[in-house]
Regions:
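Short, structured motif recognition centered on aromatic/hydrophobic residues
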Residues: 1, 100-109
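A cyclin-like helical interaction fold
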Residues: 1-95, 99, 120-124, 134-158
Length: 158
């Protein structure tokens, strides 16, 4: 999935192939280890064949898909992307996974912009626990003024 820039979490892969989460997680780790080993061998042998390029997984990777599933308008989807880029650039929440941060961003924006999107709704489309969404949201709240442009705060009466 990552090679073709269709990034999916291990949980999503488990759902697609009707696997348990543990098996999918182990499978993803094993696949990554195998790809890395093949690339290492190619470099060691100075082969000119193409190294497998894995696209980086960031919160931005998941924003568009999650916002689409939640019917979030383009303006607020762009705001979520803007926040994801700032978080990544400034390494603001390094302890959470990219898809958890994406879920937290969407909830954060939904609260600021008065959308009727609950943690449970985000959980249903992303499989991120409500506790994790809440923890990410609290971390984002600490950086609200640097993450949300003043014009958006004004527009949504914050």
């Amino acid at each position: 999935c990552r090679v073709n820039n269709y990034i999916r979490t291990a949980k999503e892969i488990a759902d697609i192939f009707n696997l348990d989460n543990t098996s999918a997680t182990k499978g993803c780790k094993n696949a990554l280890a195998i790809i890395n080993e093949i690339d290492r061998e190619k470099r060691d042998l100075s082969e000119k064949s193409e190294i497998i390029k894995l696209n980086k997984t960031t919160p931005l990777t998941f924003i568009e898909r999650y916002c689409s599933k939640l019917n979030i308008n383009n303006e607020l989807t762009q705001l979520c992307k803007f926040i994801a880029t700032k978080i990544e650039k400034n390494n603001l929440i390094p302890e959470n996974t990219p898809h958890s941060i994406a879920g937290g961003i969407i909830y954060f924006v939904s609260q600021i912009c008065n959308l009727n999107i609950t943690k449970a709704t985000i959980n249903n489309i992303s499989k991120i626990s409500e506790v994790t969404i809440n923890k990410c949201n609290k971390k984002l709240e600490q950086h609200k003024n640097e993450l949300i442009p003043a014009v958006i705060l004004k527009k949504y009466n914050q």
